[in-house]
């Protein structure tokens, strides 16, 4: 028997309102991958929960394609692998499910190809493939990060921010919203004046988070001009969730990533009341308390006993 690679990969929420394509935070929902060598010629994919059944089980699987892409880049040949997957990250809901799969594929290629990539190099690869660091960076490192990917130099730089001392509430609609569809409603360009305003709001939000001034941070998050005004109509529950959250003194209610999940930052003393109120009023969605993941990917090698 051979050793097995176990990966526990967190979900992520991106943007936090005004941090479009640059700010992200890891969340305590996980993609679990159990990977081992097999004698068969083709990779085998097994899904351990029904929510994953729509995913391909052949060479069209995203994990397979990314792993082979990395192997080719470093001129290594991967063995045939059995990949068992279990996930409580809902697909196409704005919680970074594709970023988690991408990061998992990088770790698989790194281990079974014996490439010896550092976390920094894993981040560079992930961002080059994804195009922006807002999901992949917190998925790899955990916590709350801001980052920038330079497409000319293909370099990504990230900065860690103290994890906010707040409670997070996720309100997850029953329907999917593909990132591509959500991006198609965004304008191609902004005026210089509009860009300066949005940049100032984003800068102020970051400084407020650093100072643990969550009231000010939330005020800035709610003034996004990059994406939320154009996407809110795609999420019919957004206005109702935001109105209820305001009744319980929430700091901010924003779209998680491309949506449709709605993220609320709440004072800890009000979060329980708020999530129960949301469950009672917004019955079409699932609302729950979530925890910020601070450690990122957990990698374990398990040997047969």
Curated annotation (Swiss-Prot):
Known pathway: Amino-acid biosynthesis; L-threonine biosynthesis; L-threonine from L-aspartate: step 4/5
Intracellular or extracellular location(s): Cytoplasm
Residues bound to ATP: 90-100
Catalytic activity: L-homoserine + ATP = O-phospho-L-homoserine + ADP + H(+)
Listed InterPro entries: GHMP_kinase_C_dom, GHMP_kinase_C_sf, GHMP_kinase_N_dom, GHMP_knse_ATP-bd_CS, Homoserine_kinase, Ribosomal_Su5_D2-typ_SF, Ribsml_uS5_D2-typ_fold_subgr
GO cellular component: cytoplasm
Record bears the keyword Nucleotide-binding: yes
Keywords: Amino-acid biosynthesis, ATP-binding, Cytoplasm, Kinase, Nucleotide-binding, Threonine biosynthesis, Transferase
A molecular function GO annotation: ATP binding
Primary localisation category: cytoplasm
HAMAP family: Homoser_kinase
UniProt similarity note: Belongs to the GHMP kinase family. Homoserine kinase subfamily.
General function of this protein: Catalyzes the ATP-dependent phosphorylation of L-homoserine to L-homoserine phosphate.
This protein's name: Homoserine kinase
Organism per entry: Staphylococcus haemolyticus (strain JCSC1435)
Lineage: Bacteria, Bacillati, Bacillota, Bacilli, Bacillales
């Amino acid at each position: 028997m051979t050793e097995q690679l176990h990966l526990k990969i967190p979900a992520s929420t991106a943007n936090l309102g005004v941090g479009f394509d640059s700010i992200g935070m890891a969340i305590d929902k996980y993609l679990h991958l159990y990977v081992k060598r097999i004698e068969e010629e083709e990779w085998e994919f097994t899904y351990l929960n029904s929510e994953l059944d729509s995913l391909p089980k052949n060479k069209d699987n995203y994990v397979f394609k990314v792993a082979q892409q990395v192997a080719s880049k470093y001129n290594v040949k991967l063995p045939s692998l059995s990949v068992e997957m279990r996930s409580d990250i809902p697909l196409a809901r704005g919680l970074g499910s594709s970023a988690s799969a991408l990061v998992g594929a990088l770790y698989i290629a790194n281990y079974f190809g014996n490439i010896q990539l550092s976390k920094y190099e894993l981040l560079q690869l992930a961002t080059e493939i994804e195009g922006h660091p807002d999901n992949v960076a917190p998925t790899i490192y955990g916590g709350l990060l801001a980052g920038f990917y330079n497409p000319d130099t293909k370099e990504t730089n990230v900065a860690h921010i103290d994890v906010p001392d707040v409670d997070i509430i996720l309100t997850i609609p029953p329907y999917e919203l593909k990132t591509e569809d959500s991006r198609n409603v965004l304008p191609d360009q902004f005026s210089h004046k509009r860009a300066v305003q949005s940049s100032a709001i984003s800068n102020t939000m970051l400084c407020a988070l650093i100072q643990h001034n969550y009231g000010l941070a939330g005020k800035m998050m709610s003034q996004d001009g990059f994406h939320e005004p154009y996407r809110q109509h795609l999420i019919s529950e957004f206005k109702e969730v935001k109105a209820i959250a305001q009744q319980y003194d929430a700091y901010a209610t924003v779209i998680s990533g491309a949506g449709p999940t709605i993220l609320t930052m709440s004072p800890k003393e009000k979060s329980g009341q708020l999530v129960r109120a949301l469950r009672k009023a917004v019955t079409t969605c699932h609302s729950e308390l979530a925890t910020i993941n601070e450690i990122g990917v957990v990698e374990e090698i398990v040997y047969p006993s």
